[in-house]
Amino acid sequence: MKKSMPRLTAKNAISFQGYLPINGIQQWVQIEGQETTNPLLFIIHGGPASTYSMFTEATRFFSTTFTVVHWDQRGAGKTYLKQPVMPDNLQTLVNDGLALTKQLKGAFPGVQIVLLGSSIGSIIANLMVQQAESSFAAYIATEQMTSRSHQIAFNQTLFDSKKHVLKTAWLNKLPYAASTWSAKQIAQFTIFFALQHTDVPNMVTDLFIKNLLHAYGLNIKAWLAFCRGLIASRQAIQPELDSFDYNRLFSKTSIPFVVFQGSHDPITPTAATQAYFNQVQAPYKRMIIVPNSGHLCFFSNPKFFLAELTKQVTPLIS
């Protein structure tokens, strides 16, 4: 196994970066933890193709309590760099994620796996839970996507901007029914919303770009692969995402279900997430608002996230 990050100091620590064979292609995986018997935190990134493996500082912080697993999905990041193969559909990514889950179970026998789905990854991870629920000890949703996410965000922004003529005029250029928005219009609205909330970290400028430029060992070739993967993956599966039937998300699960929600999230606003959360039946469920954060709340406020994760989830799986 290729190792390009320094090992952690704990005796039973693990620090691995490399390609693993997953459903016919080589896919990039990073695993880092200070104790191999700790629960695994398997992170399903958003996007499409917005890899989180560059967030090494935040996830190294998480690795004090969990063994953190990052996976650059088919068509994303360093997996795209190795071979520019696109997913046929969302189920392809679900299948890949479940195949990697089996490998993790083999590599860490008897260790619990906590699945975390973020943004678009919350759709993929939700489907993974439905298709292999017994593989996971708990499901954590951050930036949970729902059918009403964009509409509620738009309605709230329009209300907040009613005293500002120019802002209202710009918003009125968008169709009122957010379900009809194109990917370009969604991106435009997200940028507009972020500019209205400068008191919280901006997903693009403060989180993605900063970490892309400073991630350990990330080079220009890998950076370009990240960008090209974003474009290619969007072309491949965005039509399915645009028409996704959110009734496919589970309404009942037999494992603990915890949601982390950014206090000022422009893409998955609190009201939309709360509505879905209220519908779900689970043996244990909790929704936690992450203060002073927008989208990617667990990277915006990693200390708060880890403290709450340890408090809410660790006792349930120990």
Tell what function each PLM region has:
Residues 48-60:
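The serine-hydrolase catalytic nucleophile loop
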Residues 52-53, 75-88:
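Glycine-rich "HGGG/HGxG" loop immediately N-terminal to the catalytic nucleophile
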Residues 63-81:
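Conserved alpha/beta-hydrolase
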Residues 92-112:
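Conserved acidic catalytic loop of the alpha/beta-hydrolase fold
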Residues 160, 165-248, 255:
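Alpha/beta-hydrolase
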Residues 253, 259-261, 265:
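Short beta-strand/loop motif that positions the catalytic acidic residue
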Residues 293-302, 306:
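Catalytic histidine-centered segment of alpha/beta-hydrolase-like enzymes
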